Each structure stands twice: as C-alpha cells, then as structure tokens.
Amino acid sequence: MDEFFRAIAAESKLPESIARQLTDAGYVVIEGPVAHNKCEQLAKAYDAAVLAAHPDDVRISSSTRISDFVNRGPDFDELYIYGPLLAACCQIIARPFRLSTMHARTLEPGTPVESLHVDFKREDDGWPMVGFIVMVDEFRSDNGATRFVPGSHLATNVPGDVMEDATAEYDGEVMAGGPAGSIIIYNGSVWHGWTANRSAKPRRSIQGAFIRREQQSGVNLKARMRPETLSRIGGLAKYLLDVE
C-alpha cells in the first residue's frame, strides 16, 4: 500500500450519513464541490472547452461526449481532487486508485432515456470503480437527471438479466437531482442511467471514474498530458493521474 494512498485514507473521512448511504444505496448527492457563485464560471468554461475540442475528442450518439477534461483548463482541476470523492474511493475501492477518465456529457433537448446499466460488475474481491457526475446545470426530473436503483450494487445480476426493456422504469428507482455545482458519487456497480431530457435546454455535466491503480485506464492520461496542465497541478493531482 503506497504512502499517498495511506495519506488520502487518513485525511479523507466521510460523514457517517454519507458513508452509510454509499454502503446501503450505492450512491449519494452532495452539494459541492462547486460553490454557487462559481457555477456560472464553470458553465462558461465548459462551453468554451466543448467548442475548442478537437473533432477526434467528440463523440455524438444519444448524447454528446467530449473526452479528457483533465486538460481543458484550470476551472476543472479541483473536481477530481474533491475530498469527499476521494474518501468515497477509499471506502468503496479500498485500495490504491487513480483517475480513469473525466469527460463532458451534454444531453440535448429530446435526448431519450438511457438504458439502466452498470459501469463495472462487482468482482470477487470487491468493487473496482467509483463514478462521479458534477452537475454543470441543475439536474431535474424533466431535463435528464440520472436515475439509480438503490442497493442494486449488492445484486449478482445486471439490468439486462432481468429487464426485457432496460429503458423502462424499474420498481424503486430514484431520481438523483440537485442544484448546479452538486456532485453525484456512486459505486460503479449500481444500476443507473440518465432519463429523457424533455426540457427546452441542454443538460450539461462533467463525469469521471476512479479505478484500481493497477487497472488500465479508459484514457491514456499520461500520453495526453499537456505541459501547462502539469505545471499548475499539485502532487495529489499528479498521483491520481499517475503522472508523478
């Protein structure tokens, strides 16, 4: 067990109520890490980064996804080093971990509901992933807020095993809404998916995932790292990006 992980585990502690919800429900919504008076600045930085992205980094399907928000500017540097997020990784992954990916996702008006799914199945020796979603816009029931099935991370099956139509409403599902600047932290094995955006405006978010340190990341962050990013981030960020 490396020294950085021990330090993170020692310094990052969740309130009991949040730790319990992660254990029991598999997800939690926290009003942070972006302060209310910084949300407009974050939204402007998001839009500018999306417009400046190289076409190779843009993937358009039922939503628009822009990869590698680690290297999109200083407005995003604090998101993946947020203390409660790292504490959740210590609780769920429970071993040295690193960032696998951090990207933007926009649900345009009319985007249909996403199928319930898991990001990673639970492995025999525990849970391999923690996901997070930072709300650039308010998440509401009409604009594509993410739905979760509480406790489903404890199941041995996945939605496709038990649902004929994984886009259908599932008994007991809960909408994870919140004001702009909030963060959803979730166990990668919990059933989840975005809902339909029935509003007249896009719904924007920044999403990412932490994985076990020895696993292969979704994006080769070391190869993509820009000098200006390396020059401004600290030791904790470099450790989490595995570029120290």
Model segments located where?
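Active-site lining segments that contact anionic ligands and/or coordinate catalytic metals
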Residues: 173, 180, 201-205
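Non-heme Fe(II)/2-oxoglutarate
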Residues: 2-8, 52, 190, 195-244
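Short hydrophobic-aromatic micro-motifs
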Residues: 29-30, 132, 184-186
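A structural signal for short, well-ordered beta-strand segments
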Residues: 102-104, 132-134, 206-210
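Non-heme Fe(II)-dependent double-stranded beta-helix
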Residues: 1-25, 30-118, 122-123
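Catalytic core of non-heme Fe(II) oxygenases with the double-stranded beta-helix
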Residues: 110-177, 215-223
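Active-site rim elements
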Residues: 73-76, 170-172, 194-195
